[in-house]
Amino acid sequence: MEDRHNLNFATYEEGKLTLEEYLTRVVFYQKRSFTQAEFRRFMFAQSKPYPDMIELVAQLKVRHGLKIAVVSNEARELNAYRIRNFKLARFVDSFVSSCFAHVRKPDADIFRLALDIAQASAPQVVYIENTPMFVQIAEGLGIRSILHTDYTSTCAKLASFGLRNDEGVVHETS
């Protein structure tokens, strides 16, 4: 199954396969003890929000008048699920997702596309990412970047760029 996943995952994340097509190729090419619907429910249930980070970015948008663009490698169905269930559209201006762009990180074109959509130059942007290689690629394009490892260090780095939360300070979370 891992080989099948590796062969199909990029195509799936680039929006060239539906979830049903992907699951049929990778999981349900043979009889299973669970249904595709059960597997989908399980898969979506694994997706958890990061409420502190969501609230931080929403606050920074209001406080500093920021334009928020999300650049992600994500398949269409999971992307829609997260946007809806985590209420991301309430503060995100554009979603540059691999499933829409048909290109995925680490391809630098997805970052260039995000800059074009946002109508922003690289030095105007702060990119937050938890994958070191993607941070390096963005930095190579002149985008100020933060390697997210935890809320507190990300807040500190944002503050160093002049972006503080509503209280004007970096604060600890419980």
Give the predicted meaning of each segment.
Residues 8-9, 68, 96:
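N-terminal-biased segments
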Residues 75-76, 80-174:
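Asp-based, Mg2+/Mn2+-dependent phosphohydrolase catalytic module
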Residues 67-69, 144:
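Proline-centered loop/turn at the N-terminus of a beta-strand
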Residues 1-55, 62-64, 75-77:
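N-terminal helical cap/lid subdomain that shapes the substrate entry/recognition surface
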Residues 64-67, 123-124:
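Short coil/turn segments at beta-strand junctions that form active-site/ligand-binding loops
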